[in-house]
Amino acid sequence: MTKVLIAGFAGAMGQQAVTLVKSLPGFELSAVVGHHLTDLDPTSYGLENSTTVYADREQVETGAADIWLDFTVPAAVFENVSYALRHGMAPVVGTTGLSDEQVEELQQLAKQNGLGGLIAPNFGMSAVLLMKFAKEAAAYFPEVEIIEMHHEDKKDAPSGTALATAKLISENRPAHETAPDSTESLPGARGGDYQGIKLHAVRLPGYVAHEQVLFGGSGEALTIRQDSFDRSSFMSGVKVGLEKVGTLTELVVGLENVL
């Protein structure tokens, strides 16, 4: 049995992940981590007695799990993944907010410890396809902006998916800035900027996770959109990550790179 630890198990994504892991043949939910919990009885959370509950990552010992599945918060994810790698656990990371420099540092740490892992800005298949299609379209439509819409509790902006989309687009189009002479009567009105690609973040109740990539050309426009209406939509990608991570020899970024 492959032992899985879920960090951030009490959150919305964490709860979906708990249900998934418990249903997967060949996988065991060996441990969970919830920040500053006072009740460490697994049955209080609907878990088996065999599942260890930790209130802090520093309490997790080597051998507690084979896989560290992270659905925590941007402020904690770097230290969480570092801890997992130093203690022999292959990370599968759904938490966003890691900088490029932090990802590179984690990749080096994974190499030093002989572990593979997966960092996925989005586990939804529709989002993965959106990124793929947007990259292809950028070769023909260099004028592009991105709008991402999420629930009001999402901490980081822009979303990891929107930023990953911008990075992929920038790989497949010449250096370009849309409307460079535009001015803002309200600071921030034109959104954030990644290599000339404007990114706009919406945070509102009623939304889960949504993204639009808008391309403009002479006399025409192209919009690529994906919508995640329920967090269960991400679990097919999490399942792939859990099943594939044991075959990886490096820390991979992007679910599309293990499909």
From Swiss-Prot:
The keyword Cell membrane does not apply. NCBIfam families: dapB. The active site is at residues 150, 154. The keyword NAD applies. It is an enzyme of class 1 (oxidoreductase). (S)-2,3,4,5-tetrahydrodipicolinate binds at residues 151, 160-161. One of its GO terms (molecular function) is NAD binding. This is 4-hydroxy-tetrahydrodipicolinate reductase. It catalyses: (S)-2,3,4,5-tetrahydrodipicolinate + NAD(+) + H2O = (2S,4S)-4-hydroxy-2,3,4,5-tetrahydrodipicolinate + NADH + H(+); (S)-2,3,4,5-tetrahydrodipicolinate + NADP(+) + H2O = (2S,4S)-4-hydroxy-2,3,4,5-tetrahydrodipicolinate + NADPH + H(+). Catalyzes the conversion of 4-hydroxy-tetrahydrodipicolinate (HTPA) to tetrahydrodipicolinate. GO terms for biological process: diaminopimelate biosynthetic process; lysine biosynthetic process via diaminopimelate. InterPro entries: DapB_C, DapB_N, DapB_N_CS, DHDPR_bac, NAD(P)-bd_dom_sf. Coiled coil: none annotated. It is found in: Cytoplasm.
